Every structure is written in structure tokens, then in C-alpha cells.
């Protein structure tokens, strides 16, 4: 009998073992769809980004008008731009839900997979930040100025660091050029780290909603989960296309319709919605270095989560107290996101400070305490 090329060819064999004959737990829910959705987001962003880059000029005098030209004169340029801008939002929605799933179901106990995932989040945030600067609108320029300025809070080398990042004494042409170079490079780095992420995942196999070994009950990935992933894909593409076609500027800032002007500052400088929670934490500390450290900690804290797991059970499926804390944390993040979009005045300042405090308290103190308490209550 002739060998099956899918199982014998050196390259096809890898694809087969990763996407077709992959043994998968039989009970993973829709919360496990987001990994494949993130892969689709990345592919979409790279393709639309490449098409945009073909018409973009990374120069302060031409950047804004080159984006306008893409939207007005390039065949379907408006659609490509709208898909790229809103695709970023969906990328973040998917990654936040993916991380939330990981926390709820204890997937972080696969430490290598989790740590590469957090690195992916950080790289994605860097990519989105440098990408937001490229249209060279008012919010692009001032967002870049405010966020890069945070590096000046680093003791002793801060100012040098900022001027090195800027390529001058302010955000100007060299900054835009290097941000474009970085924005082009980073998605490919993300793709590379994604392969490492998957390699680590396939060492252990997927977790499942019960958090117990599923070795006794595995099914092939294809056709079961490939079909389920296509359903998830349809459910994501529908709102993405709806947003991109009907209200493409809903999540953007109106300030970005004004070309960048270093002489006039917008009344409220704020990042895109997916960074607002971190921005609120940054602003809640009335000290530059303290704020920067809190901002960094708000994401880097994810690296600590595996070390803070004190429960004898892996998932939160049968742990109602931890579930309550989890959803309080989720609500807390929504509050931080809202506060990040508000001006710095009463009562938003105090709400932001309380929400920031409870964010760190929940993750660092309450989760381990409640995990230990549940062990005692269940006599584990």
C-alpha cells in the first residue's frame, strides 16, 4: 500500500500532527476557539498591512495625505484600511478573552506556553502602539509623545533613552520612520513566537474545562474542531465586517482626522480603547516613575499568575469563590477601561485609584488566599 503523503512527507507530517490528527480533549468548549481566531487575526493584519504599506509613505509631510490617498484613490483602499484598523480591535478582544480563559481554567500551569503567550501580548501591544502613530494625525502624534516620554522616568538614563528612541529632541520624522520599520517587523516576530507558543502547547496537549487529564478521551482535531473553529471564525468575521463597513470610525478618535500639529495639544490625550485599562492605572499614581512602574506591572503581573496558584484544583469550574473574584476582576477591568477614557478630574481620579488598587489586590492577594481557603473548606 502506498504511504499516505500527509503522514510521510517531512513538511506535511508537521502540519498533520499540528492541525489534522492532533489528539484533542473531547470536551473543550467555545472558550478554546480564540487561539485559532488569533491566528486568523494575525494573518488578516499581515495581509491588509502589506497592502497598506504598498501605498504608505513614512514621512511627516506625506504620511497623513498618503493614508487619505489610500482611502480615496486606491481600489478598495478604504476597505483595507478599515479592516486593518478594526482588525486590531478584534485582535485585542480575542487575546483578552484568550487570557481570561487561561486564568479561569488554570491553563497558566503550562508555564512555558503561558509565558510565551504573555510575551506575545507584550509584542502585540508594542505593534499596536507603533502602528497607531503611522497615520500622523493629532492623536497619533500626541499619543506617541506622551507614551515615549514615559521612558524619561527611568532614573539616570531616562532622557538619553527618550532622545535615542525619538532620534532627535522631539517626536519627528526619524521617529515616524523607525516606527514604520518596527510596525512592519513586529508582526513577523509575533508569527515566530506563535510557532514557539504552539510547540510548547503541543508538548502537553490542551487543557480542558474540568482541568483533569484527558488522555483517556481524545478525538482528532479534524474534522471536529476544525469545523468548530470555522463557526467561530464566521462569528468573528460578521461583527468585524459590520464594523468596518457600517461604522469604521466608531472606535477611533476624531482628533486623528486632523493632521499632526506639535503646536496644538488635543484637550484629552488618550490611547485606543484596548490600552485604556493600563492608561488608567498609569494615571492613578500621582508620580511619573511610580505610574510607569504600575503601568508595566499591570501587564507583567501575568508572569506571576502561575506562582500564585494555591488551589489543589486546576480550574475554577467547581470553585465558586474564585469564580466570584474572577468576575469582579473582569468588572474591574471594564471600570479601568472607562476611567482611562475620562478626563483627570473628580470623581474619576478616586474611582481610578480604587480600581487600580483592587486590580493588583485581587491578583496578588485575594486569589491565593481564596484558593487556600477553598482547599480548607473542601478538606483537600
Curated annotation (Swiss-Prot):
Subcellular location: Mitochondrion inner membrane
Leader sequence residues: none
Residues engaged in binding heme b b566: 98, 197
Gene3D superfamilies: Cytochrome Bc1 Complex, Chain C
Ligand binding (heme b b562): 84, 183
Topology relative to the membrane: Multi-pass membrane protein
Necessary cofactors: heme b
CDD domains xrefs: cytochrome_b_C, Cytochrome_b_N
Organism superkingdom: Eukaryota
PANTHER family: CYTOCHROME B
Role played: Component of the ubiquinol-cytochrome c reductase complex (complex III or cytochrome b-c1 complex) that is part of the mitochondrial respiratory chain. The b-c1 complex mediates electron transfer from ubiquinol to cytochrome c. Contributes to the generation of a proton gradient across the mitochondrial membrane that is then used for ATP synthesis.
Assembly information from the UniProt record: The cytochrome bc1 complex contains 11 subunits: 3 respiratory subunits (MT-CYB, CYC1 and UQCRFS1), 2 core proteins (UQCRC1 and UQCRC2) and 6 low-molecular weight proteins (UQCRH/QCR6, UQCRB/QCR7, UQCRQ/QCR8, UQCR10/QCR9, UQCR11/QCR10 and a cleavage product of UQCRFS1). This cytochrome bc1 complex then forms a dimer.
UniProt protein name: Cytochrome b
Organism: Cyrtonyx montezumae
Name of the encoding gene: MT-CYB
Amino acid at each position: 500500500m502506498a504511504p499516505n503523503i500527509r503522514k510521510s512527507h517531512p513538511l506535511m507530517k508537521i502540519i498533520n500532527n499540528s492541525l489534522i490528527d492532533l489528539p484533542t480533549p473531547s470536551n473543550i468548549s467555545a472558550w478554546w476557539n480564540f487561539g485559532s481566531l488569533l491566528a486568523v487575526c494575525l494573518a488578516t493584519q499581515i495581509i491588509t498591512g502589506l497592502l497598506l504599506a504598498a501605498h504608505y509613505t513614512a514621512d511627516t509631510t506625506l504620511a497623513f495625505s498618503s493614508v487619505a490617498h489610500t482611502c480615496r484613490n486606491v481600489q478598495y483602499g478604504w476597505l483595507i484600511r478599515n479592516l486593518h484598523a478594526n482588525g486590531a480591535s478584534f485582535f485585542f478582544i480575542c487575546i483578552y478573552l484568550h487570557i481570561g480563559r487561561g486564568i479561569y481554567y488554570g491553563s497558566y500551569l503550562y508555564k512555558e506556553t503561558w509565558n510565551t503567550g504573555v510575551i506575545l501580548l507584550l509584542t502585540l501591544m508594542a505593534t499596536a502602539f507603533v502602528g497607531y502613530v503611522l497615520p500622523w494625525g493629532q492623536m497619533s502624534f500626541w499619543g506617541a509623545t506622551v507614551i515615549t516620554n514615559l521612558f524619561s522616568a527611568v532614573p539616570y538614563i531616562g532622557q538619553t533613552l527618550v532622545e535615542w528612541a525619538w532620534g532627535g529632541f522631539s517626536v519627528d520624522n526619524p521617529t515616524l520612520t523607525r516606527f514604520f520599520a518596527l510596525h512592519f517587523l513586529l508582526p513577523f516576530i509575533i508569527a515566530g513566537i506563535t510557532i514557539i507558543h504552539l510547540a510548547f502547547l503541543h508538548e502537553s496537549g490542551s487543557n480542558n474545562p474540568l482541568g483533569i487529564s484527558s488522555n483517556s478521551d481524545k478525538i482528532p482535531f479534524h474534522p471536529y474542531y476544525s469545523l468548530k473553529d470555522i463557526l467561530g471564525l464566521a462569528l468573528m468575521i460578521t461583527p468585524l465586517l459590520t464594523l468596518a463597513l457600517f461604522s469604521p470610525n466608531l472606535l477611533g478618535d476624531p482628533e486623528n482626522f486632523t493632521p499632526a500639529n506639535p503646536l496644538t495639544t488635543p484637550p484629552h490625550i488618550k490611547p485606543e480603547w484596548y490600552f485604556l485599562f493600563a492608561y488608567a492605572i498609569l494615571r492613578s499614581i500621582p508620580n511619573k516613575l511610580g505610574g510607569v512602574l504600575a503601568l508595566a506591572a499591570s501587564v507583567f503581573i501575568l508572569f506571576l499568575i502561575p506562582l500564585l496558584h494555591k488551589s489543589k484544583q486546576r480550574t475554577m469550574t467547581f470553585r465558586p469563590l474564585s469564580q466570584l473574584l474572577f468576575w469582579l476582576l473582569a468588572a474591574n477591568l471594564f471600570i479601568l477601561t472607562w476611567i482611562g477614557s475620562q478626563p483627570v478630574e473628580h470623581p474619576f481620579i478616586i474611582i481610578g485609584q480604587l480600581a487600580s488598587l483592587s486590580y493588583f489586590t485581587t491578583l496578588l492577594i485575594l486569589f491565593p488566599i481564596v484558593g487556600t481557603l477553598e482547599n480548607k473548606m473542601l478538606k483537600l
